Amino acid sequence: MTEQVLETCKAGINAWQQTFNSQDAAGCAEQYAEGTTMVARPFGTFVGREQIQAFWQNIMDQGFADVDYTDVEWTPEGDDGYMLTASWTMNKAYGVVHKEHWKLQNDGRARLEFDEFEVQGER
């Protein structure tokens, strides 16, 4: 079961990355569970899909694109989820994912239940 949960969580982050790289803020927000808290340092804290979608739309409108992940580590979190940590780069910035909690939902997909990341610099 754990390997299946991990593969489902990996499919979730892949879907998020594809929607971001397609400049689809609504698609990005759909990868978050309802009521999720996203801590985006240094920008602030955003709660719920509506606020999260607006944040990503603003980032996209500023020309940020082409996100990629490196140094990805997955740690089991309960029986139905994983914690992800990673480094990330975009065309205009780079940073780290401090903690993403990907958890299986009732529809069988994994979505973010918590997201904390940081922009560490410009490129």
Regions found by a protein language model. Give the residues of each.
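A beta-strand edge to alpha-helix "cap/lid" segment located at domain peripheries
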Residues: 1-27, 37-123
